[in-house]
């Protein structure tokens, strides 16, 4: 892409952040882990903000039940790999962007091989608290910048989404489990008054739970059940919330990279 073409495509970004900041973004390499309700929107925002290299990591295929919250889910993409559909979209947005596809799930075993210091930032959009904790601990101990996202399910009000240190979230069971795991299993700051130094996007909204009779309320159903945001059960979800989680994460990453 010629300098003129790049400036036409991202002139609005330059006029907002400045030329020096845009060059930093153009030279940045950012990983998005989990290309779902949060990660798909985060990847989109990165591409539309002139980030030069993006690595997408996820093993899932697109399911029809992803339609309510995931950017890549359309009638034409059902059954295709999320990383493939998303990579094609990102390169259509910015043909200069290099997009690496890793069609795999992150696990505690493969984190050291997949997450290295080649990344200027890692965006964690995983929904498994043990894997999230392993990823954050790896980044912490290897001085790789990471931002994590809390639970986006069961919430309706995107105006309550904010960023704080992972130790300071509230009304977020996923973030609570992650920080407990970090302290108990990974040795991060067992002093509860000390911060982790890891940004977390979360919502201060109280989650609502689906009830057996088809209603929703802030009380957990009597029979228990899943509290995950998955395809067939557990929390419901809204694009307005999951997308905002992704956008807020990218806004923080861009701010940190261009300061």
Give the location of each predicted region:
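Hydrophobic/small residue at the entry helix of a nucleotide-binding pocket
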Residues: 38-39
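Conserved N-terminal Rossmann-fold NAD(P)-binding element of oxidoreductases
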Residues: 32-34, 57
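Glycine-rich phosphate/adenylate-binding loop
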Residues: 2-6, 117-121, 126, 131, ...
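Glycine-rich phosphate-binding loop and adjoining beta1-alpha1-beta2 segment
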Residues: 51-94
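N-terminal charged helix/coil linker that caps or initiates catalytic domains
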Residues: 1-31
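Short amphipathic alpha-helix with an adjacent loop that forms part of the alpha/beta core around
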Residues: 109-118
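Conserved acidic residues
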Residues: 104-105
């Amino acid at each position: 892409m010629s300098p003129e073409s790049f400036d036409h495509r991202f002139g609005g970004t330059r006029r907002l952040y400045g030329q020096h900041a845009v060059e930093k973004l153009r030279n940045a390499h950012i990983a998005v882990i989990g290309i779902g309700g949060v990660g798909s929107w985060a990847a989109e925002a990165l591409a539309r903000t002139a980030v030069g290299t993006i690595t997408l990591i996820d093993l899932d295929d697109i399911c029809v039940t992803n339609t309510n919250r995931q950017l890549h889910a359309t009638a034409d993409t059902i059954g295709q790999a999320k990383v493939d559909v998303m990579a094609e979209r990102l390169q259509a947005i910015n043909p200069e962007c290099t997009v690496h596809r890793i069609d795999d799930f992150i696990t505690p075993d493969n984190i050291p091989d997949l997450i290295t210091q080649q990344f200027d930032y890692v965006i964690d959009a995983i929904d498994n608290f043990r894997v999230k904790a392993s990823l954050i601990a790896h980044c912490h101990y290897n001085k790789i910048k990471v931002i994590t996202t809390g639970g986006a399910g069961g919430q309706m009000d995107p105006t309550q989404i904010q960023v704080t240190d992972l130790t300071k979230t509230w009304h977020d069971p996923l973030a609570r489990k992650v920080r407990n795991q970090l302290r108990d299993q990974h040795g991060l700051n067992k002093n509860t008054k000390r911060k982790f130094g890891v940004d977390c996007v979360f919502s201060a909204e109280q989650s609502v739970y689906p009830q057996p009779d088809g209603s929703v309320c802030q009380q957990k159903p009597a029979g228990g059940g899943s509290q995950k945001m998955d395809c067939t059960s557990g929390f419901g979800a809204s694009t307005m919330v999951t997308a905002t989680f992704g956008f807020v994460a990218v806004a923080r990453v861009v701010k940190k990279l261009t300061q």
